[in-house]
UniProtKB/Swiss-Prot annotation:
Biased composition (Basic residues): 69-83
Ranges of Acidic residues composition bias in the record: 54-64
Enzyme class, spelled out: hydrolase
Region (Disordered), start-end ranges: 1-83
Catalytic machinery residues: D191
Organism placement in taxonomy: Viruses, Varidnaviria, Bamfordvirae, Nucleocytoviricota, Megaviricetes
Keywords associated with the record: DNA damage, DNA repair, Hydrolase
Name of the molecule in the record: Probable uracil-DNA glycosylase
Length: 370
């Protein structure tokens, strides 16, 4: 009997825990479990199938004659495939095992800087997105008047030798890992982490709040861990800051600004405003009953675009040390907004609320413990 491809985003498994990414015996262990790969060995391929490595490429029951037929068919189509490939852009992403994009190890870091990827200082964002499920969205934003300006601004930053983070291969990291149809929860951050974990290794990795393995846990993420422990969603705080397992379970983690400059906060916030707004609109218009988690003023502003009757919104102050214990005054969602006071981050069971809502919609809850 042939095996079925296993989708790591599937809700069909009734188990409460997802496949383990880290060893339960040693949370400091940074060894990568390469159990999930992108079936995309050529960077020029547009396909991005996710499957488990222990699955056979062919059926156990496949006959020898069927195998020969496939071999002949493959040889016949080889030339045509090559000619098609030549017409495609040479993608800068998609040629790695998928876990290398989200299980990044600071002690084994191989991602290139912006100037290494675009030595001519001409940024082409389309080369940084390989998951085909997002191509419709990207085609839409490419038609907008702001998009050429966005690429021009990023190109000008390179000409000025700004050290942009995250690095290009990681810019659309969450999008490249998680297809839009598998998103359950959207957690909005504000700005990529601006600093370096060690020399040549930025904290920023294209997933809000997450950092590479063997990097110190940032204070905002430490406060998130404290909240998880407080409401019994986590046994103890991990010694790493990698949130890969959340993403693989359907948590879409982005910042309102996709880039910043190394050691500087907020400098590219306006650069990405229109792009991020269109991304939120795309999700809210094309998908139903998503959960949006708005921490802080920037995330709240973006979520004012979300229809609260169609989607579920959880709002509080930001988990940063400066606001984690403070309430936040802003406007309510929906038509006829009024000034309201939102609770402090540390007073809300964010992750419990998420799972309660998922269960109420017969969706598999997120296993938050790392």
């Amino acid at each position: 009997m042939s095996k079925k491809n296993v989708d790591p985003f599937s809700d069909s498994d009734s188990s409460s825990e997802p496949p383990s990414i880290f060893s339960s015996d040693n949370e400091e262990n940074s060894d990568v479990d390469n159990s999930v790969i992108i079936n995309d060995k050529n960077t020029k391929s547009d396909e991005a199938d996710i499957k488990y490595m222990d699955e056979d490429e062919s059926s156990d029951s496949e006959s020898e004659s069927e195998s020969k037929k496939k071999s002949k068919k493959s040889k016949k189509s080889k030339k045509s495939k090559k000619s098609v490939t030549k017409k495609k852009n040479n993608l800068l992403v998609g040629n790695r095992i998928i876990t290398e994009y989200i299980l990044i190890d600071a002690n084994n870091y191989h991602f290139k800087s912006w100037i290494e990827c675009f030595p001519d200082c001409k940024v082409n964002l389309k080369l940084l997105l390989f998951r085909p499920e997002w191509f419709d969205f990207f085609k839409y934003v490419e038609s907008k008047t702001y998009f050429p300006q966005l690429e021009s601004k990023l190109s000008s930053y390179l000409e000025k030798r700004q050290r942009i983070v995250p690095y290009p291969e990681l810019l659309f990291n969450t999008m490249n890992v998680l297809p839009p149809g598998k998103i359950k929860v959207v957690i909005l951050g504000q700005d990529p982490y601006p600093g370096s974990c060690i020399s040549g290794v930025p904290y920023a990795m294209g997933c809000s709040f997450s950092v590479p393995l063997n990097c110190p846990v940032p204070k905002s993420l430490a406060n998130i861990y404290t909240n998880l422990i407080k409401f019994n969603h986590m046994r103890k705080a991990p010694k790493h800051g990698c949130l890969a397992s959340w993403i693989l379970q359907g948590t879409f983690m982005i910042n309102s600004a996709f880039t910043t400059v190394l050691n500087e906060s907020g400098v590219h916030a306006r650069t990405w405003e229109s792009f991020t707004a269109d991304l939120i609109d795309y999700l809210t218009d094309n998908y139903d009953d998503l959960i949006f988690v708005a921490w802080g003023a920037h995330a709240h502003k973006l979520c004012q675009r979300v229809d609260p009757k169609k989607h579920y919104i959880i709002t509080s102050s930001h988990p940063s040390p400066y606001s984690v214990s403070n309430t936040m005054t802003s406007m309510s969602y929906g038509p006829n907004p009024k000034k309201v006071t939102y609770p402090s981050f540390n007073s809300v069971d964010h992750f419990g609320k998420i799972n309660e809502h998922l269960k109420s919609r017969n969706k598999k809850p997120i296993f938050w413990d790392l």
